């Protein structure tokens, strides 16, 4: 939505870590890059490229080659859950932020599983001093009640004009009170 809103509709690919976990919707399972997650679901959702977790050490050596003209964002779990409890090193998060700034793409740090105090910090990314553009959160805000939110900076929010994003259950009063 952000790149579309600024006249760059072809900038729509997201680079993710293979075997990550970003949810169970059709697009989210393809973001995972995991055959286990996508087997039996189709057609394949385009728009995702992947790097292996090992390429996060020490400074994502292969990631530069994966960023193309149509890359819109890099999305990583700050602490990988499904692929084993593997925190992304602070230096790697810092490198990703610098790389995203240089390439003029967004940094999405998925904190659905590890955010809201579950890592010892309010957000796991805070220890790295990195400021992401987008932060999906969920499990920690509802204490077991189904609720989620997507936090974003002003620049990204400027692309979220009325009618560009919606949810069947969005804004549920009980969920909002619990969260």
Indicate where each model-derived feature is located.
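Conserved N-terminal phosphate-binding loop of PLP-dependent enzymes in the Aspartate aminotransferase
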Residues: 1-179
């Amino acid at each position: 939505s952000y790149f579309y809103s600024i006249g760059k509709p072809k900038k729509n690919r997201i680079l993710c870590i293979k075997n990550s976990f970003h949810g169970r919707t059709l697009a989210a399972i393809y973001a995972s890059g995991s055959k286990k997650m996508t087997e039996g679901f189709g057609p394949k959702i385009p728009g995702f490229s992947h790097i292996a977790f090992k390429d996060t050490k020490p400074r994502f050596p292969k990631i530069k080659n994966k960023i193309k003209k149509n890359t819109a964002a890099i999305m990583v779990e700050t602490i990988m859950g499904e692929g084993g409890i593997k925190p992304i090193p602070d230096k790697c998060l810092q490198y990703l932020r610098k790389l995203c700034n240089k390439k003029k793409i967004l940094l999405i740090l998925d904190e659905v599983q590890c955010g809201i105090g579950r890592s010892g910090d309010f957000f796991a990314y805070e220890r790295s001093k990195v400021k992401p553009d987008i932060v999906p959160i969920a499990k920690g805000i509802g204490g077991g009640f189904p609720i989620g939110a997507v936090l974003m900076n002003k620049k990204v929010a400027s692309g979220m004009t009325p009618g560009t994003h919606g949810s069947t259950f969005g804004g549920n009063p009980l969920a909002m009170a619990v969260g």
